[in-house]
Amino acid sequence: MGQKVNPNGLRFGINKQWLSRWVPTDQLQMAKWLVEDDKIRKYLSTKYKNAGIDHVEIERDQQRVNVYVYAVQSGLLIGTEASEKKLIELAINKIVGRKQLVSLKVVEVQIPELQASLMAREIADAIENRVSFRIAQKMVIKKVLKAGARGIKTHVSGRLGGVEMAREEGYTQGVMTLHTLRADIDYSMQEAHTTYGIIGVKVWINRGELFGNKLVNSVAHAANKEFSRSSKPKKGSFNRSSRSKNTKPAPKQAVSE
């Protein structure tokens, strides 16, 4: 029986890079560096929540730590005359130790609508602000498809709408080939903290296919074209993954002898 796996973990080493890239000398150093990487990511995501951080990549060796922060609003992380950047480097230096040389590099996300973590966070924030979970998902789906994605899948679970019994619901639109390893699938899971409990939000975004270093049927190609589809999807285009509508068969034509 087929099992669902994390699309990011399935593609590490194929068309995705590991978020932490280093080689420890022993198991003790590996455990120490894992904890430090987790502290760095939690510090950045907590203090600079409004910067729209997509993900953080960390490279290190025995003397140096390079931190790459991918964010929508890079100016909040750099500051005037790189003042905020220096404060972040000092904070990271306290986490990893004074002997390590810390270098912070901020990369601006060009198309935030194609990043699964940012879109999942947008749905979670809307649910926290008491927006209907269905409306929140449909708004994000329209935005992602308009930005040039080939397909998107959303899924929410928990006490949806504050009801007593937990349930799950989701939408799928476009092409979503989870088993194709060359497909550039971005996946993220976020949580919405409400007064009636935690709502889990999952988002899958299909950005095209990768053949070596060449991106085919991707956002880069789609961005150069005008989309013929309107921003408003057709009626009935949002299909819940949990159920499908039955279509009536066409009436048979009478055959005269």
From Swiss-Prot:
Region Disordered: start-end pairs: 223-257
Occurrences of domain KH type-2 (ranges): 40-110
Keyword terms: Ribonucleoprotein, Ribosomal protein, RNA-binding, rRNA-binding
UniProt entry tagged with the keyword Ribonucleoprotein: yes
Keyword Membrane: no
Family per similarity comment: Belongs to the universal ribosomal protein uS3 family.
GO biological process, one term: translation
UniProt biased composition (Basic residues): 231-246
General function of this protein: Binds the lower part of the 30S subunit head. Binds mRNA in the 70S ribosome, positioning it for translation.
Self-association and partners: Part of the 30S ribosomal subunit. Forms a tight complex with proteins S10 and S14.
One cellular component (GO) term of this entry: cytosolic small ribosomal subunit
Native species: Ureaplasma parvum serovar 3 (strain ATCC 700970)
Protein's UniProt name: Small ribosomal subunit protein uS3
